[in-house]
Structure formats: C-alpha cells, structure tokens
Amino acid sequence: MLSNELETCLNSAFQVAREGKHEFLTVEHLLLAILDTPRVKEVLKACGGDVPRLAAELREHIEQSTPRLPDGDEREVQPTLGFQRVLQRAVFHVQSSGRKEVGVANVLVAIFSEKQSHAVFLLNRQDVARLDVVIYISHGMSKIADERGETKAALVTRYSRDHQHPLMCTLEET
C-alpha cells in the first residue's frame, strides 16, 4: 500500500525524531523527510519552491518548537494527530482514485490540508500552493516560466479559443 520510497521517508522521519529526543513526530518532520526524494524536489521546484531553504526552515522550526523528552525517558516518539491525518488523507485519496500505492507526492498534497501547520505556512510563504502541486502532479504543468518566459498554463490559455477551455481550439490550429 505504501511505496518503498514513502516507507523509507517515514522511517527517516521517526529516526530524526528519535535521535533528537523529540516527544512528537510532526507534519514538519514528515515534510522534511519527503523533501529528500527526487519526486518531491521536482514538484516543489516546478511550483516555485526553494527546496534547500525550505529544508533549513523546517529544521530550524523542528529544533525550536518540538518538545524534547527528558534524559533517561525511554518513551517512544508519538506521531501527532496532524501527522496521522496527513497519512490517512493520502491513503484515502489513493484508494478512492482506484490506485494501489501511496507515494510521496500523495503525502505532499495531503500535507496542504493541515492548514494550521508550520509546514503549510512555510510552503505558502514560498508561494507554493496545493493547486499548483496538484496541477503539476496531474498534468506536468509548471508555474515556472520556460526560456521564453511562458508557463505551460499560459500557453494553453493563449492557444485556446475562449481562453478558458484548452480543448476548444480555433480552426487555424486544427
């Protein structure tokens, strides 16, 4: 059900939290873990994100804001409700779309539903929006301009007859 890549990321997030003696495993831990994957890097760059800066800001937030277990306390790291909801949303979305495997891109989209999380705040601060991520994952349409200064979305609009429906082209184009 979970892709190998996602399982590796989840293990990495738990390991980081355990080594840091963090009491909780948060949405920020999860986003930081999936940032290391090629797919998430590609998606965020296409949506205008600065991955190294985002990673640094997440690390800083985790270090400053995550409660730590006292020395000698051997309790296991506990995932927050937000962390659990993100994974549940990703699984539900994949199941409802008839697919079998949950990947890191599904988790990235699900993170945006945790609107009160610092992870979403940092993504939004870089003007990375859920819609941009979904459009890129679904259609490969980047919000970053090509060498001519046009985005794929702008090209679709320019070449559509009514500037809203890309499948309705003018006669000259057919």
Regions found by a protein language model. Name each.
Residues 1-174:
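Histone-fold recognition with a strong bias for associated Lys/Arg-rich disordered tails
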